[in-house]
Design a protein with these regions (language model features):
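Acidic, low-complexity intrinsically disordered tails
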Residues: 373, 379, 595-652
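N-terminal [4Fe-4S]-dependent radical SAM core
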Residues: 1-19, 29, 231-303
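Glycine-rich beta-alpha loop elements in corrinoid/cobalamin-binding modules
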Residues: 10, 37, 56-253, 260-261
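Conserved, mostly hydrophobic/aromatic
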Residues: 165, 275, 310, 335, ...
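Conserved SAM/AdoMet-binding glycine-rich loop
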Residues: 24-26, 55, 59-60, 341-489, ...
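Flexible glycine/acidic-rich beta-alpha junction loops that bind and position SAM and/or redox cofactors
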Residues: 84-93, 141-143, 173-178, 202-207, ...
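N-terminal pre-triad scaffold of radical SAM enzymes
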Residues: 25-30, 291-318, 336, 343, ...
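Terminal amphipathic helices with adjacent charged low-complexity linkers/tails
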Residues: 61, 190-241, 255-256, 264-267, ...
């Protein structure tokens, strides 16, 4: 039946089901689109002959809300949805967000905090012995003990707190089908201890010995000692590749073990094609029409997923823990076939919004050996500089983009999911840069240097500042050749571990020199299972156990943010304080290099009058890629003649 999967018992009856094999409880609204993890998992199970009922966003205060289908034949599946529920709910300053793009009408409050734990306990109150498997981003990144930024404490494995039997972690296609088949065969869920890509709990120490499992520091140790936490985290980080990973276990109360089997094997291209070639309705369930639909679909409805996995190795990113470092791709035929489907949509205007993934311009593993031996342990492909074995080649991606541009009904194909500029520079052939600027930039290209300080970039795992500056030159030069006026928009981050006020001032000076003011400033967000979050919590870099300064005081973080928008009058007092504390009062004055003027008077109201900045700045964009590199500048400072009150009110 080509329709949405059942969301009510009546839907099941239409299909002739007495009870579904699985009931899938999710924190998002039900969107049947391959950009949504629950859609992929449910459709994949369906393709293997299993029936799945969906309970989207149940009322966690009412036990009846998860009894819609009764007890499933094989088990419950639980996911928070496409995002960690805490990231979904709170900004980095821990303020409640006003909207939830994954809920009907963008309404906030339709899922609980720590959704997987809450849903799991809700299920367990009614179905005490029914198998329960949790998965998705929230469960995957909390699979072992982890620092939780929102409660500011180390929490246990989510497997224990949720009451679940298994975690299907990472990209769960292989493990969820294997779990379903094991349950179908009659195997008890507590005996499913042998599958890659899963986490289970046991009291059987002999099982650990038979599987040659490697012990992590126990939970009490990592909770009590930040050094033990950093050591444990880095062992986990080094065991995220299917080919090289050990089985790991963590001890709780001396007799209970949470065991992480090695990650699932990356999907082959034909397997990726099958997953994305499954039948999807490609939109939200019609029950949400009255609320105005689900806003998140608008960002992905006319986008194409080309790849998964990333060998970029950014320390603030959890992709290594979730998708792994081995890039997996779909075939051209699969992607072109999906693009043709888009052209038949009634609201398709001819524009494909994105063709990419975690990193758009990664279309193959970084080197040949990864497919047989996995990624290197203890080494990165691009950081601190590209590995000599790196295969920097954009020819496949160029050919794919050309095929998409030539499809009937397609006017333009954009790239929005981000490119690695250091990988572009590593490719000796400039064809991709030319094609990118000529065909695939929608007025501005977003890139992510993140910072300009060498010390901070080292902690970020990002390339040195001169690499980004070289890309700016080449991008500008290419646009000049093409006669294009196109912007570069850099993503920048404040308060990342390693950034003191000194480095924040260095970034402000760079922004002054390139005449750029970010419209929005992103503070570092300590989310579970990243190296940067480990640094934030422990004050240690787990790679070498060196001490790392981290701004945790909200006022200092506010100063670092303000320095990135030093020309905003509202930020004057914070910028003044930051420059004073950093010993950089030389940047307070009337010279063109100064960030602000001296105080015009005492107090906040007088301080705001003193705003000035060197060279003026554009807001939100910089660097037109046209001849002359014309800058849009806002006239400010003493050159501007003040009108008298009489002039302001003068009648024409």
């Amino acid at each position: 039946m080509r329709d949405f999967l059942p969301v009510t018992r009546a839907d099941c009856e239409k299909r002739g089901w007495k009870q579904p094999d699985f009931v899938y409880v999710i924190g998002d609204a039900y969107v049947d689109h391959p950009s949504f993890g629950p859609a992929i998992i449910s459709r994949l199970l369906e393709s293997h002959g299993f029936s799945v009922g969906i309970i989207p966003q149940p009322d966690w205060r009412d036990e009846k809300s998860i009894q819609v289908f009764g007890e499933p034949r094989l088990g419950f599946l639980v996911s928070s949805g496409n995002m960690d529920s805490m990231v979904n709910h709170y900004s980095v300053s821990k303020k409640r967000r006003e909207t939830d793009l994954y809920s009907p009408g963008g309404e906030m409050g339709r899922r609980p905090d720590y959704a997987v734990v809450v849903y799991g306990n809700l299920i367990r109150r009614t179905y005490k012995h029914t198998p329960m498997i949790i998965g998705g981003i929230e469960a995957s990144l909390r699979r072992l003990s982890h620092y939780d930024y929102w409660s500011n404490k180390v929490r246990r494995s989510i497997l224990l707190d949720s009451g679940a039997d298994l975690i299907s972690y990472g990209m769960g296609e292989r493990s969820i089908v294997a779990i379903a088949q094991a349950l179908e065969s009659g195997l008890a869920v507590e005996d499913i201890t042998f599958l890659d890509g899963t986490v289970y709990k046991t009291r059987d120490r002999e099982l650990l010995e038979r599987n040659h499992a490697r012990a992590l520091p126990d939970f009490e140790s990592v909770r009590a000692s930040k050094q033990a936490y950093a050591e444990s985290f880095y062992i986990q980080y080094q065991n995220t590749d299917h080919f090289t990973a050990d089985t790991l276990y963590e001890t709780y109360d001396k007799k209970l073990f949470v065991v992480q089997n090695r990650p699932a094997k990356p999907l082959l291209q034909e397997e990726m094609d099958r997953v994305y070639g499954l039948f999807y309705m490609r939109t939200y369930h019609p029950m949400y029409e009255a609320a105005g639909g689900v806003p998140a679909i608008s960002e992905v409805k006319f986008s194409l997923i080309s790849n998964r996995g990333c060998f970029g190795g950014c320390n603030f990113c959890a992709l290594t823990f979730h998708q792994g470092r081995t890039v997996q791709t779909r075939s051209h035929a699969s992607i072109v076939a999906e693009a043709r489907l888009l052209t038949y949509e009634p609201d398709f205007k001819g524009y494909i919004h994105d063709v990419g993934g975690p990193t758009a311009n990664f279309r193959h593993p970084s080197c040949e050996k990864q497919l047989e031996k996995g990624v290197c342990t203890g080494r990165q492909c691009l950081f601190p500089s590209p590995c000599k074995n790196l295969r920097a080649d954009h020819r496949d991606y160029i050919a794919l983009l050309k095929k998409l541009r030539e499809l009937p009904g397609v006017k333009k194909v954009f790239i929005r999911s981000g490119i690695r500029f250091d990988y572009v520079l590593a490719d000796d052939d400039e064809t991709f840069l030319r094609e990118l600027c000529a065909h695939h930039v929608s007025g501005q290209l977003k890139v992510a240097p993140e910072h300009i300080s060498r010390a901070v970039l080292e902690r970020l795992g990002k390339p040195a500042p001169e690499v980004y500056k070289e890309f700016v030159k080449r991008y500008t030069r290419m646009n000049e050749r093409l006669g294009k006026e196109q912007y570069l928009v850099p993503y920048l981050m404040s308060s990342h571990p390693g950034a003191t006020l000194k480095e924040a001032v260095e970034l402000a000076e760079y922004l002054r020199d390139i005449h750029y003011t970010p419209k929005q400033v992103q503070d570092f967000y300590p989310t579970p299972s990243t190296i940067s979050t480990c640094m934030y919590y422990t004050g240690l870099d787990p790679r070498d156990m060196s001490a790392v300064y981290t701004a945790v005081n909200p006022h200092e973080k506010a100063m670092q943010r303000a320095l990135m928008q030093f020309n905003n009058p509202k930020n004057y007092d914070l910028v003044y304080e930051a420059l004073t504390k950093a010993g950089r009062t030389d940047l307070i004055g009337f010279d063109k290099k100064c960030l602000i003027r001296p105080r015009a008077g005492r107090g906040k109201s007088g301080g705001n009058k003193g705003i000035a900045f060197g060279g003026n700045a554009t807001s939100g964009t910089y660097l037109r890629g046209s001849a002359g590199q014309k800058m849009q500048r806002r006239e400010t400072g003493p050159k501007r003649k003040k009108k008298t009150i009489r002039n302001i009110h003068k009648k024409k």
